[in-house]
């Protein structure tokens, strides 16, 4: 799985995170996992107890596999019936999606597993999503539709982990948008915890200095990196990294 190393001097433990909105992906654990119904099927029940039971089962499996974090629930919006990942997103209704996700987060948390709600935000199209896909919306649409599931999962579910999106919001990379990562998520909604990017270095536009300064605390890298992606050594950059470390350890 994706890992962070232990740092004994500050009491940070080694962690392993895994992908899979409907299971614990065995590409990472090398162990079999129960596959559950797709998120859209769970949402069709309108039953938050069912969503909780799903999260609870994921948490039990993750705990048995020594998995710390789960890259899910995925909770973007069904903007079209032909959306490429509608199967792993709950609904076109942000309130329904948010309540389902919050219940799943709470269920997983019962077993010490933190759930990364994703992809924050407006990652509602697969076509060219990793190629600087600029998404435009007014503030009312953002808050009432596209942000709503995440807001509910933060406030009701108490999630301590978020995965940011590949998409651009207007002309700015979502993970590098301080108005999203800090102002809305932390200042307005009261989120405490870490934000990790979607796959990092898979797209040429991703810049570690930009995202860490914006409030995106970690970069999801699937290969060994001999040195940090952070190349700026100013006082501001160092303070941003300290803040990111604090957020990661809180999660």
State where each predicted segment sits.
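Glycoside hydrolase catalytic-domain context in secreted enzymes
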Residues: 1-251
């Amino acid at each position: 799985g994706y890992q962070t190393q232990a740092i004994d001097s500050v009491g940070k433990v080694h962690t392993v995170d895994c992908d899979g909105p409907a299971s614990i992906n065995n590409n990472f654990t090398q162990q079999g996992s129960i596959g559950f119904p797709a998120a859209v099927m769970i949402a069709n029940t309108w039953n938050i107890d069912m969503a909780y039971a799903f999260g609870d089962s994921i948490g039990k499996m993750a705990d048995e596999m020594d998995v710390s974090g789960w890259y899910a629930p995925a909770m973007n919006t069904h903007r079209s019936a032909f959306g490429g990942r509608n199967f792993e997103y709950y609904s076109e209704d942000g309130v329904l999606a948010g309540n389902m996700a919050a219940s799943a987060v709470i269920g997983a948390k019962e077993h010490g597993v933190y759930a990364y709600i994703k992809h924050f935000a407006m990652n509602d199209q697969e076509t060219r999503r990793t190629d600087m896909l600029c998404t435009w919306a007014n503030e009312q649409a953002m808050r009432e539709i596209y942000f709503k599931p995440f807001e509910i999962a933060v406030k009701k579910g108490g999630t301590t982990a978020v995965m940011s999106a590949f998409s651009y919001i207007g002309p700015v990379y979502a993970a590098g948008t301080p108005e999203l990562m800090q102002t809305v998520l932390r200042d307005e909604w009261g989120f405490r915890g870490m934000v990790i990017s979607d796959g990092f270095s898979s797209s040429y536009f991703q810049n570690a200095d930009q995202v860490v300064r914006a409030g995106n605390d970690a970069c999801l890298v699937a290969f060994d990196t001999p040195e940090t992606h952070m190349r700026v050594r100013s006082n501001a950059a160092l303070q941003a990294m300290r803040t990111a470390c604090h957020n990661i350890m809180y999660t």
